[in-house]
A protein has these predicted regions:
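Active-site and donor-binding regions of nucleotide-sugar-utilizing enzymes
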Residues: 19-24, 30-41, 45, 81-184
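A nucleotide-sugar donor-handling region in carbohydrate enzymes
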Residues: 23, 56-59, 162-237, 396
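A generic structural motif
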Residues: 43-49, 250-254
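Conserved nucleotide-sugar phosphate-binding/catalytic loop shared by glycosyltransferases and other
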Residues: 46-92, 102
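Donor-nucleotide binding loops and adjacent catalytic segments primarily
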Residues: 57, 68, 203-297
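A donor-sugar binding/catalytic signature common to diverse glycosyltransferases
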Residues: 117-118, 125, 140, 166, ...
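Nucleotide-sugar donor-binding patch of glycosyltransferase catalytic domains
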Residues: 313-360
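C-terminal amphipathic helix plus adjacent low-complexity
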Residues: 354-396
């Protein structure tokens, strides 16, 4: 299938520049899309727009909107996302409704032609809903993935049905999107954008050491834990169990990153703020390049972040995937799964940490390598006319 051609086989119309609006709500999401955004900016057929919302505007999480500018990208608009949305599902639903209304106006003001969203987060769902209703083309990255432990997984598939163009990471993800009834010509296998240029983007060890002077290379655990349940008390208990498991049987140093802003996150934050473990550092936010450097040089990554499933294999870093959040995802051989059980966590650590040194895994990454950003930009620059894209017919 030629990605530049629509269902009729007619070539895309090149007469105008398409405005592609990327809506981003988290530090991680923006970072993994950076090579794609640069490829869009470099295309003569496309004009990049960025709308920041969610955690980017939250000072408790580092006000990461500044990192967008530091990466050389301009923010064209912001959409408020109240901090209380992470405290309860009702507050999150109310915030989503308000965001849809504001996003509809923002997309109209910007004159956006294509709205680009990633994954399964509620901010992406709000953007896709607003764009679809307002007759904008929705382009969705990482559709067809499975993460059965997340409530957001249903949002991923809802976004797939709202989207007009799909950029999938693996052949299995492509098959799932097709089984949802999407036309094959709309579905493009490009690999995971987060893996694109990964090793080049990582900060060198000297920069990691400058930011965290006490760390020893391959002598620390990088901990990234996000909520699964909206109950903050339960998530605080789970975070404490994770810490209990990581305290013994492995490296004595830890870098603990704050969670995303999903309901229940406040419980994890409370646990990290009260952290008294010797050798442990809790950090609200680090830049993408520093995060990648930390991941590359860690003895292991522990928690339930998708970065452990998708990106860590490109560095050979071992991963302890804890709990159900990433259940169902395709994974590489560097990943060991366990529950929120200190005994299981210690057992997993012993498989990795041997004679005071961690194992490293040389494995091909199932999520691909370089080139995803370039491929996405090529597809976007050669899309068929809007009237073809916007007319969706369920294929099955």
């Amino acid at each position: 299938m030629n990605p530049s051609r629509g269902p009729s086989g007619a070539a895309a119309s090149p007469q105008r520049v398409r405005r592609v609006c990327f809506v981003t709500g988290t530090r991680a999401e923006f970072g993994l899309m950076l090579t794609t955004l640069r490829a869009i900016s470099a295309s003569e057929a496309l004009r990049l727009q960025i709308v920041a919302t969610g955690m980017h505007l939250d000072p408790r999480r580092g006000a990461t909107i500044e990192h967008i500018a530091a990466a050389g990208c301009r923010v064209d608009a912001t959409v408020p996302w109240p901090a209380r949305a992470e405290t309860a599902p009702v507050a999150c639903a109310a915030a989503t409704g308000r965001a849809i209304a504001v996003l509809a106006r923002v997309l109209s003001d910007l004159g956006s032609d294509v709205v680009l969203v990633v994954g399964d987060r509620v901010e992406a769902f709000a953007a896709a809903a607003a764009a679809h209703i307002c007759r904008r083309v929705v382009a969705h990255v990482h559709g067809g993935d499975r993460a059965l432990g997340q409530i957001d997984d249903s949002l991923r598939h809802a976004i797939t049905k709202l989207a007009h163009v799909h950029f999938v990471a693996t052949p299995a993800a492509r098959r799932r999107v097709l089984r949802l009834g999407e036309d094959p010509w709309r579905v493009h296998l490009v690999g995971a954008p987060g893996v694109d240029g990964l090793t080049r983007a990582a900060a060198p060890w000297s920069a990691v050491k400058a930011a965290f002077p006490q760390l020893r290379r391959r002598g620390y655990v990088l901990v990234v834990l996000h909520p699964v349940d909206p109950d903050p008390r339960l998530e605080q208990q789970r975070a404490q169990l994770v810490l209990e498991g990581l305290r013994e049987g492995g490296p004595q140093q830890m870098v603990v990153l704050y969670p995303n802003n999903d309901p229940g996150a406040s419980g994890i934050v409370r646990c990290w703020k009260s952290l008294r473990t010797a050798g442990a550092i809790a950090v609200p936010h680090v830049s993408r390049d520093l995060f990648l450097g930390l991941m590359r040089d860690a003895a292991m990554l522990a928690g339930n972040s998708s970065s452990g499933i998708i990106e860590a294999a490109s560095f050979g870093t071992p991963v302890i995937d804890i709990g159900p959040r990433q259940a169902g995802r395709e994974r590489n051989r560097n990943v060991i799964h366990c529950g929120y059980d200190p005994v299981q966590i210690r057992r997993a650590m012993k498989r990795i940490w041997r004679r005071g040194r961690p194992l490293r895994y040389a494995c091909a990454n199932v999520y691909g390598g370089d080139g995803a950003g370039r491929r996405i930009a090529q597809v976007l620059s050669a899309l068929p006319p809007d009237e073809v894209l916007l007319r969706k017919i369920i294929a099955c």
